[in-house]
């Protein structure tokens, strides 16, 4: 009975632990820390509708700008490194907004490991490793792009793993659904930082290998490789 409820109970427990590790005293430091000086400033440009030059794609900074907008921030703070946040900047909410992406990574890691058909002990080990990894927890607690990058990397991997398990139901509605979600996740991760293209490479190499095996199997009917056309 417990095993049947595990896919529901386990992610709830892991998410609760993630909430603690990512949100506990997240607003204690009221100083602009590390790259908050850059990405907070870029978010301010969006809020003030100003053009600026940046080496990264825009989605991450747009989400930072969204967190500022939801926090009631008007974009006037300069985000100078080491400066104290003024009272009218709700930096705690902005950090918590970013932390939400880091929190989601933990249940995603659990479900991904299950989709890859690992043993229960391995699934829990992977989930706890992601939960307790110090660098993952730390970068999720500041106004940075890394938690978003990790989150969309996890969604790409999970959707791809689920898509892979549906090979026997190729061209079904669910198969197409997870294929589209994989593509959407790839688009999101590539729109946060250029290193997200490694996710494209990962799925691309898998696709090449899968097609190579299918085209090389002469016993496989053509309809199993290409969708039927009227």
Report the location of each language-model feature.
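Membrane-interface transmembrane helices that cradle and orient dolichyl/undecaprenyl
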Residues: 114-117, 156-177, 213
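Short helix- or helix-capping micro-motifs
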Residues: 18, 123-131, 138, 158, ...
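Perimembrane helix-loop-helix junctions
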Residues: 159-168, 186, 199-230
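Short acidic/glycine- and proline-prone juxtamembrane loop motifs at membrane-interface regions
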Residues: 33-34, 135-149
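Transmembrane signal-anchor helices characteristic of membrane glycosylation enzymes that use polyprenol
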Residues: 3-33, 49, 132, 188-189, ...
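Start-transfer (signal-anchor) and selected internal transmembrane alpha helices
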Residues: 1-21, 104, 108-110, 114-115, ...
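Extracytoplasmic catalytic/substrate-binding loops of multi-pass membrane glycan-assembly enzymes
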Residues: 28-41, 51-66, 74-76, 89-92
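Transmembrane-helix motifs of polytopic, lipid-linked glycan transferases
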Residues: 92, 96-117, 155, 159
């Amino acid at each position: 009975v417990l095993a049947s409820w595990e896919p529901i109970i386990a992610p709830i427990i892991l998410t609760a632990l993630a909430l603690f590790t990512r949100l506990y005293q997240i607003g204690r430091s009221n100083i602009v820390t590390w790259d908050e000086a850059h990405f907070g400033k870029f978010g301010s440009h969006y809020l003030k509708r100003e053009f600026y030059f940046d080496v990264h794609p825009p989605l991450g900074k747009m989400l930072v700008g969204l967190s500022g907008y939801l926090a009631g921030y008007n974009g006037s703070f300069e985000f100078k490194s080491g400066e104290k946040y003024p009272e009218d900047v709700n930096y705690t909410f902005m950090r918590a907004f970013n932390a939400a992406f880091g929190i989601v990574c933990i249940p995603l890691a659990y479900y991904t490991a299950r989709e890859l058909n690992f043993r229960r002990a391995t699934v829990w080990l992977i989930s706890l490793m992601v939960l307790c990894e110090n660098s993952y927890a730390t970068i999720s607690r500041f106004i940075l792009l890394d938690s978003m990058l990790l989150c969309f990397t996890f969604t790409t991997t999970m959707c791809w793993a689920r898509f892979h398990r549906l090979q026997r139901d190729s061209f079904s509605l669910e198969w197409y659904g997870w294929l589209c979600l994989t593509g959407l996740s790839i688009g999101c991760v590539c729109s946060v930082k250029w290193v997200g293209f490694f996710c494209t490479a990962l799925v691309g190499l898998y696709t090449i290998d899968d097609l190579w095996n299918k085209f090389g199997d002469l016993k496989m009917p053509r309809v199993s490789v290409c969708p039927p056309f009227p």
